[in-house]
Amino acid sequence: MKSLETKLFDHLAFLYGEEKAPTITERFLRLLKEFRAKHEELVISIPSEKVSERDSILITYGDMVTKEGEAPLKTLASFLEKYLGDVISTVHILPFYPYSSDDGFSVIDYRRVNSELGGWEDVAALSKSFRLMFDAVVNHTSSQSAAFQGFLKGDPDFQDFFTVVDPDIDLTRVFRPRATPVLTPFETAEGTKHVWTTFSADQVDLNFANPDVLLEVADILLFYAANGAEFIRLDAVTFVWKEIGTTCINLPRTHRIVQTMRTVLDMVAPNVMIITETNVPHEDNIAYFGDGTNEAQMVYNFALPLLTLHAFHNADVSILSDWAATLDLPSDQATFFNFLAAHDGIGMLPVKNILPLEDLSDLVARTQSLGGYVSYKSNEDGSKSPYELNINYLDALSDPDEVKKGIDHLDELNINYLDALRNPDAPENNIELIAKRFLATQAIMLALRGVPGIYFHSIFGSKNWTEGVEQTGRHRTINRQKVECVQIEAELNDPTSLRHHVFTGYKKLLKARMSNPAFHPYGAQEILSIQPSVFALLRTSLD
């Protein structure tokens, strides 16, 4: 069996060539030696399981719940301890670093906490009650970061940190997750340069073809481990390696980058788990497991949200069940990160070749009829196609025909729609029914093999925040509402509220999962075929 040091050399030789690999490897080893000396406690591998049926991960922004005069991270900690301390093991704080756009995903400084949220002491306080998951937003950095500002000023240390491309070069094969140009012109000390920007003009891609970039990213990951991260989410990692003439996603060197990160952590922080966020077709997504021991310990199960939504809209679980039957694990060291909702929209690309195009079109139309939005991406031929559905998952389950009937009836009676929400007899205002329907989807996610990821607005029964979209002009804001602590607590304590019904029901599901070893993330799973309207599975404990 190869030593981890040998594996590290092999990865770096694959990425940068045999000639450069010895020098680059030596630089990595110096970094790891220094880290090991400072953090001996992290080097000790805990023999017990890293995750079990008792684990679930709450996904939240650091300021999702606020209280006047208090640092949001402090408010979040006390709120979560009070309401979820007995059912949630881990908190995934979405990017809490200083940023310039995209709600945190355009990082200015990876090693600081956004002062508007609190400080590292608040993160440490949260870690006393929960395990922590951090974001590594390392495909790109903010145009306001010190590195990119240095690049613009001609600082030689940063000239190769970003990918500069001649705008006349044909980039039509490059996969685009957005409808924006892949290159953005910037004025530098040396004139205009066109720089690679996968997601927006403010999010400038890092150049991993430069080993200095990978070394810096490795140092950032180790910094996160030293500050309490037991799980690290690699945001948009599928885009990190660029090769002109290819799609620039899921390339062999992309996987080697992830494998290098895994090896680095295995060498000095072996209890930290990597979770890859790769919003791509299912077969490409699960490739980030590697051989089951050398890449991500968990991958986002991106096809699950839309397939579950499709099953409920069509009252037919056949496609969902057939797909779920293929969810094999490559080893006893890797499993799925199951989720139905998060801060982003519901991805459509993961179900490519699983759902018929007609069904996808129906889901798009249904989302729009329910007050949601659709975000588009550019295609190779210049056309655009739906990339994600932007809608709260609870609202996405509604019946648009019933909603329309209700609105039409209100118009006839000259009743304001918001006032009518108080009418429990309206088909789409039956709170108990809405909660049960929503919890049925969550039960599927919680029962499947893997570790559940639960979005804040799911467990607390939120709905579309259309006012937020109007405020920001961004579709994703519909599912990113920040709530005042006093308001949400009042609703949670009101037995007639939707939040109360969803929250109390969700906690019952989590307690049932936690108490049964059959729901272990690595336990056996068999999908049962009973009838099209019933999703059934058999879970078996490891022993």
Regions found by a protein language model. Give the residues of each.
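Alpha-helical packing segments of well-folded alpha/beta enzyme cores
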Residues: 119-122, 126, 213-224, 257, ...
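Short alpha-helical segments and helix-capping/turn motifs at coil-helix boundaries
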Residues: 43, 72-80, 118-121, 133-134, ...
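A structural motif
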Residues: 88, 229, 450-451
